[in-house]
């Protein structure tokens, strides 16, 4: 049933609340009829295209259908509403990496080759521009004549620093620029400074060698002798005082007297015993010796005729 047009629609009235279910049913029926018409319309067109010549439509098959439609009146138009199921989109985006049928792989290769050629051309242009750029040449060194150097040296001895006016005047006289005169004076002052430094270094001489550290033993500490420390520096070997005995005669084969008792000593006068031959004590460290007949005391290899030469046995030098 469809609501009558005479009724007023108030959203908060009791009738509208009660008739809400009926309105929803009518909307659902209208939506269903619209869908059926949309789906059946192509089928009816197809049937009309293939119908036989003797078929004139549903009115000819049912003669009372037109009168029934006239009595019922025109069917109400269904309300427009959005479909329950949205229609599928007509365009699907192509996923990344899917092959494009419209593109040919040969076209991709051609594009890649064109890009590579463009990059190579750009690189060649940049290299050519860098090569064409002229290098900055160094200014040639200014060579002064002997007259100019002589005049500059003479002025430098008089005045080491010049004012701008004096510098311009000297440059005009020497036919130089003010900058050249300025740089020459700067270099000359630096040269004098280096010469003074070298002379000072020559006068000072070479630097002294670094001090060497020598270990010295500590013998006394706080007024007390360091016995423990000095024992470590004792000599590695000891010297005895009585390494040799001096009381023993070095030649035991000979007697105590220089002259043999078999020969006589009458030819020479005897000296006083107290002056020349003191008595030797047993505890004396020195060895006494006597001189007898020099002719009779001879060495085994010498003849007896040599009376002036004799050997003195038992003499020690102290």
Curated annotation (Swiss-Prot):
Gene Ontology MF terms: chromatin binding; DNA binding; DNA-binding transcription activator activity; DNA-binding transcription activator activity, RNA polymerase II-specific; DNA-binding transcription factor activity; DNA-binding transcription factor activity, RNA polymerase II-specific; histone deacetylase binding; identical protein binding
DNA-binding region: 137-196
Localization (cell): Nucleus
InterPro entries named among the record's database cross-references: HD (IPR001356), HD_metazoa (IPR020479), Homeobox_CS (IPR017970), Homeobox_NK-like (IPR050394), Homeodomain-like_sf (IPR009057)
GO CC, alphabetical: cytoplasm; Nkx-2.5 complex; nucleus; protein-containing complex; protein-DNA complex; RNA polymerase II transcription regulator complex; transcription regulator complex
Keywords noted in UniProt: Developmental protein, DNA-binding, Homeobox, Nucleus
Function: Transcription factor required for the development of the heart and the spleen. During heart development, acts as a transcriptional activator of NPPA/ANF in cooperation with GATA4. May cooperate with TBX2 to negatively modulate expression of NPPA/ANF in the atrioventricular canal. Binds to the core DNA motif of NPPA promoter. Together with PBX1, required for spleen development through a mechanism that involves CDKN2B repression. Positively regulates transcription of genes such as COL3A1 and MMP2, resulting in increased pulmonary endothelial fibrosis in response to hypoxia.
Protein's name in the database: Homeobox protein Nkx-2.5
Organism: Rattus norvegicus
